[in-house]
Amino acid sequence: MKFISWNVNGLRACVQKGFLDFFNSIDADFFCIQESKLQAGQIDLDLPGYHQYWNYAEKKGYSGTAIFAKNEPLSVSYGIGIEEHDREGRVITLEYDNFYLVTCYTPNSQNELKRLPYRMQWEDDFREYLKALDAKKPVVLCGDLNVAHNEIDLKNPKTNRKNAGFSDEERAKMTELLGSGFTDTFRYFYPDAEGIYSWWSYRFKAREKNAGWRIDYFITSKRINDKLQKAAIHTDVLGSDHCPVEAVSYTHLRAHET
């Protein structure tokens, strides 16, 4: 099964920049997006063969997530069941026969780490949410997790040590998540790969210079490592300041057939 995740940085804009070309060519079983920046009814996306699940932020033009799935799930949930966290449309969970698919757009800690205390609470609550799912079935988590875990995951680690996305605190929370029984699928296949990123600032010709960050992930329950077949980052795909990331599993992960 093929999973794709992409922070589209505004879906309406991305649709004008080739979103559907990539969507159709990649032919994913599950296609997850973050930062849709939409409210209900603002786009009519024709995706034959896919079920669409949307989570919108209360604030207009902000955040938002969606999952497009070929197979209808057993159940769908929006958010993580904590009102403080669930106003910004950041999480969707689909339940299938023997796994959960979760897409997430993690809150940014913002300039001068102004939102770091909230981010820390989010990290703890979201990790507990994932662990509770994992106690029932394996989890496939994807999305913009807004952290470059290690120095190898961004171009300029030394100058970004105290910036949002590479603070010691955020990195430690990712370490804690992975230590709770989860795998960073890209590093599972490519533990030493350098210069492969998923986000580039629009400033300073960052993408042209490949001055990027790897902050978009597929994180899976460690006990299904043997079912992972592939991880990829589609750095050549334009349309957003992020590029799509991919994971492929052997079909031991079954989607419910309808």
What is each model feature region?
Residues 1-9, 98-110, 142:
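Active-site-proximal beta-strand elements of phosphoester/diester hydrolases
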Residues 2-11, 22, 40-52:
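Internal alpha/beta domain cores that form substrate/cofactor-binding pockets in large enzymes
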Residues 37, 42-109:
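Structured beta-strand-rich core segments of catalytic domains in phosphoester-bond hydrolases
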Residues 81-82, 107-123, 160-162:
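Surface-exposed cleft-lining segments at the edges of enzyme active sites
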